[in-house]
Amino acid sequence: MSPIPHIEGVLSADEVVQTAESIASLQLDTGMIPWFPGGHCDPWNHVETAMALDVAGLHGPAERAYEWLVDIQLPDGSWWNYYLPDGSVEEAKLDTNVCAYIATGVWHHWLCTWDRAFVDHLWPTVQRSLDWVLSMRKPNGTPLWACTADERPWDYALLTGSSSISHALKCGAQLAELINEP
C-alpha cells in the first residue's frame, strides 16, 4: 500500500485523510457517492472520489464505490450520465468519457492496493465499458462524445473527453496485460 501523500506546509497527510473521510461520509449503502447530501452522481466523478478514497487508504469504501458501478452497469457496458440517490436516472445521456473512466480508476486502485483479485473481479465490467466506448467511434477512430437514450450518437467529439478516453484505454490495456487478457 502507498503512503498517504502530502505537501509539506500546504497539505498534511492528516488533512488528506480528513478530506477522504468527508467523502466517505457521503457514501450511500449502495456504494454511490453523491456530489453532496441528497445530490446526484455521475460515474466519472464517482470514479474520481473512489480514487481519492484509495489515496487516503480508505480502500473498503473505494471498493464499495466500484461495486456500485458493477451493479448499475447497463447490459451494453455503458452507464447513464447522472443518477439520483434513489437509484433513478437524472440524465439519460450516454457519455463515452464517463463510461471509459472506470478503467482509470481500477488501474489506480491496483497501484494503491496491489489487490489482483479485485482487478480480476472488476475486469469484465471494465472490458464491457471499453468495448462500448470503442463502438462509439467515427470512421477515422475518433470517439464521439455521447449518444441519446435511444442510441442516436452525437456527431462530434470533445478534446478533453477524448483525452480522458485515451488515458482510460491505456489503463485498460495495462489491466488486460496484468491479467493476461488478449
Residue ranges and their predicted role:
Residues L26, A52, I72, G105, ...:
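Generic structural signal for bulky hydrophobic/aromatic residues embedded
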Residues H59, R128-S129:
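Glycine-rich loops and low-complexity Gly/Arg-rich segments
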Residues R64, H121-P124, R128:
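Primarily a tetratricopeptide repeat
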Residues E21, L28-G39, N81-Y83, E90-A100, ...:
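The feature captures the catalytic groove of carbohydrate-active enzymes
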Residues M1-G9, V47-P61, Y101-F118, S164-E181:
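Well-ordered alpha-helical scaffold segments within catalytic/enzyme domains
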Residues L69-G87, C99-T104:
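A short glycine/small-residue-enriched secondary-structure motif
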Residues M1-W44, V55-W79, N140:
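Low-complexity, Ser/Thr/Pro/Gly-enriched N-terminal "stalk/linker" regions
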